[in-house]
Amino acid sequence: MSWQTYVDDHLMCDIEGHEGHRLTAAAIVGHDGSVWAQSATFPQFKPEEMNGIMTDFNEPGHLAPTGLHLGGTKYMVIQGEAGAVIRGKKGSGGITIKKTGQALVFGIYEEPVTPGQCNMVVEGLGDYLLEQGL
């Protein structure tokens, strides 16, 4: 299965039990910042933004004072799981990033999708990839 298939079929799909509700954007990005696959709507990000995200996974709390930036959008960092999940909020939407052994799984959402639904979709795929040794 291609990485694009994971994005299209497992991240940008209808949320279970909520037909028509789906993430706004999604991607799978290597730890080095290389894009493995992304939705057409995923923002163009700067290398320093990806570096900041990777630093926060290695040094939890790094992004808390400045916020998480992706594609020029600033998200307020909210509760996550140190070294495993970063969550951010901006207005009625937000972002979830799950770290696997080799990649970062990104999901960006806006209402009516809820933070919990985004977490479920992104972390579900991330956990699956971890189980596969990825």
Swiss-Prot record:
> Which keywords does the record carry?
Actin-binding, Allergen, Cytoplasm, Cytoskeleton, Disulfide bond, Phosphoprotein
Alphabetical list of CDD domains matching this protein: PROF
Superkingdom as given in the UniProt entry: Eukaryota
Per the UniProt entry, the disulfide pairs are: C13-C118
List the GO cellular component terms. cell cortex; cytoskeleton
Q: What is its main location?
A: cytoplasm
**Residue interval(s) of motif Involved in PIP2 interaction:** 84-100
Record InterPro entries: PFN (IPR048278), PFN_euk (IPR005455), PFN_sf (IPR036140), Profilin_CS (IPR027310)
Tell where it localizes.
Answer: Cytoplasm, Cytoskeleton
Q: Which SMART domains match?
A: PROF (SM00392)
Query: What does the entry's PTM section describe?
Result: Phosphorylated by MAP kinases.
> What is the designated name of this protein?
Profilin-2
Organism (species): Olea europaea (Common olive)
